[in-house]
Amino acid sequence: MKTLTRKLSRTAITLVLVILAFIAIFRAWVYYTESPWTRDARFSADVVAIAPDVAGLITHVNVHDNQLVKKDQVLFTIDQPRYQKALAEAEADVAYYQVLAQEKRQEAGRRNRLGVQAMSREEIDQANNVLQTVLHQLAKAQATRDLAKLDLERTVIRAPADGWVTNLNVYAGEFITRGSTAVALVKKNSFYVQAYMEETKLEGVRPGYRAEITPLGSNRVLKGTVDSVAAGVTNASSTSDAKGMATIDSNLEWVRLAQRVPVRIRLDEQQGNLWPAGTTATVVITGKQDRDASQDSFFRKLAHRLREFG
């Protein structure tokens, strides 16, 4: 009898342990697959592609790669003597047409005062037409001068905002064309996190919800707030042929891959360039309030850590 009782006890204990293990595994699976989190997240920032509005030889480069610069700080300078001469030529044209316009204005005024008693109407009209032509030429010369002045100002390339110079690929002596990107500027205090959440987890993602961001390779947890959720993503399964007809890719009905939707997360505190734009992180959406880690059970703490590996 004792032997039977002992066997039943062992069987019951084993069964209970198996059931508990199954429950733990099931809860872990649900927590892992359905709670709003993703390892596919990246730090991002506002980046300005700086390109000159004038062409010419680069005479000075005043910064080095990855340097922190202030707004309006000079980055590099393009061939100023050429544009200074162009401005001087334009100013000379303006001065010439100003003198010529004054002469033609006096001539037209004199003929208009004398009237048809001293000369023909044709001569009077001709003087007025010449004056109008010279005034138009003066206006054109003034516009050319203003453009030359603007070009001269734009030979000095300045930082549009505080930030870090990155991917600097210009050097003194090189010729740069108008509109060609010379350097990128990563704006200071513009960093945010772009999390690519699976569509099956969007139910737990809303603007204003709190988020935890763990950079890859770091134990530090940053705090943030969901700023916005993308309103749409590209449908890669549908395209159009040459005649505009829809082309739909074949899918296996029993295999459905969840689409990923960009979610923008605003950081509570800017971290400088400690985690550069493009680096990866794990994001967990905790809901309307921050998660109190001190109140988490061992199971939840373990689950949070396992997210870093899967």
Curated annotation (Swiss-Prot):
It is a single-pass membrane protein. Its main location: membrane. It is found in: Cell inner membrane. HAMAP family: AaeA (MF_01544). It comes from Salmonella typhimurium (strain LT2 / SGSC1412 / ATCC 700720). One of its GO terms (cellular component) is plasma membrane. It comes from the Bacteria. Pfam families: CusB_dom_1, HlyD_D23. The keyword Transport applies. This is p-hydroxybenzoic acid efflux pump subunit AaeA.
